[in-house]
Curated annotation (Swiss-Prot):
Residues 257-335 are annotated as: Head domain (RuvB-H). The keyword DNA-binding applies. This is Holliday junction branch migration complex subunit RuvB. Its EC number is 3.6.4.-. It comes from Baumannia cicadellinicola subsp. Homalodisca coagulata. The keyword Hydrolase applies. DNA binds at residues 293, 312, 317. ATP binds at residues 23, 64, 67-69, 130-132, 173, 183, 220. SMART domains: AAA (SM00382). GO terms for cellular component: cytoplasm; Holliday junction resolvase complex.
Length: 335
């Protein structure tokens, strides 16, 4: 139940503000994630033909793959507004109620890190997601009474890097569940090319390829690297990004040919050198490299595992033969 006096939306919701934002606004402009894009196109078109709100959508996968961008696209395609918040910000039932009661029909509510919602907030979400209703408490003590408030039909888009941490009752209320995968190099080249054009940058195919290869399959990283390579090119190469310029800039940034940064290399080399290739438990590994276990699980490991440099086993993490080859090291034993 929600106390009516606690409905204050100001500090917990932000209208989407596309200031100097070149991210795609429509599905037709969305690069990559072909299966997700085609499925969402059908689901959105069907909902619009019926005049309904789109079913609630759960997006999961490693960080930086476009979950927020896709939420904005859904709002645009449904001709509604996007309201954004995150799981940790929603601390009280009144926080969520304030957001929901300010929505318009077919608006999209985007909750990032939805796996971090408190049980109290989840309980409020259930009737809102299923019946578009809220339970509100009016008054106090013996005179208090509960009323149900109808809210407009809306779409909840939840994003998470840890789908296993979402409770089953919440997960089961999402009609559409989509996993975002790491991007192939070609798709990243197209994303970088479009961003470079928007920024009026001069970049060759070789420059595009070099940045894309080192971007860990992640658009967010690709665009961050593009901005840093742009800085390097403006200072040392008259603003033109060629293969050699991109290579020199990325080497200076300590991003190697596999896309590894300092932390990636440290993680693998600690397993190889200190733990003889593994297996090593997550807690020991976190202590050895001075990182939180959540950072290792959510940020570092997914790409290393997907690319075949690291294995998770019941006994712990193991550096693969591919990791040894990358560092030109000899395995002390078979893996």
């Amino acid at each position: 139940m929600i106390e009516a006096d606690n409905l204050n939306v100001t500090s917990i919701i932000t209208d989407y503000n596309p200031i100097v934002d070149y991210r795609p606004k429509k599905l037709v402009d969305y690069i990559g994630q072909t299966n997700v894009r085609e499925q969402m196109k059908i689901f959105i078109q069907a909902a619009k033909m019926r005049g309904d709100a789109l079913d609630h959508v759960l997006l999961f996968g490693p960080p930086g793959l476009g979950k927020t961008t896709l939420a904005n696209i859904i709002a645009n395609e449904m001709e509604g507004s996007l309201r954004s918040t995150s799981g940790p910000v929603l601390e009280k039932a009144g926080d969520l109620a304030a957001i929901l009661t300010n929505l318009e029909p077919h608006d999209v509510l985007f909750i990032d890190e939805i796996h971090r919602l408190s049980p109290v907030i989840e309980e409020i979400l259930y009737p809102a997601m299923e019946d578009y209703k809220l339970d509100i408490i009016i008054g106090e003590g013996p005179a208090a009474r509960s009323i149900k408030i109808q809210i407009p039909p809306f779409t909840l888009v939840g994003a998470t890097t840890r789908i296993g941490s979402i409770t089953s009752p919440l997960r089961d209320r999402f009609g559409i569940v989509q996993r975002l995968e790491f991007y192939p190099t070609k798709d990243l080249q197209n994303i970088i090319s479009r961003s470079a054009a928007n920024l009026s940058l001069s970049i060759t195919d070789g420059g595009l390829s070099e940045i894309a290869k080192r971007a860990r399959g992640t658009p967010r990283i690709a665009l961050r690297l593009l901005r840093r390579v742009r800085d390097f090119a403006e200072v040392r190469a008259a603003g033109k990004i060629t293969n050699n310029v991109a290579m020199n800039a990325l080497n200076m940034l300590n991003v190697d040919t596999a896309g590894f940064n300092f932390m990636d290399r440290q993680l693998l080399l600690v397993i190889i050198n200190k733990f003889l290739g593994g297996p090593v438990g997550l807690d020991n590994l976190a202590a050895a490299i001075g990182e939180e276990r959540e950072t290792i699980e959510d940020v570092l490991e997914p790409f290393l595992i997907q690319q075949g440099f690291l294995q998770r086993t019941p006994r712990g993490r193991i550096a693969t033969a591919e990791a040894y080859r990358h560092f030109s090291l000899k395995q002390s034993r078979d893996i």
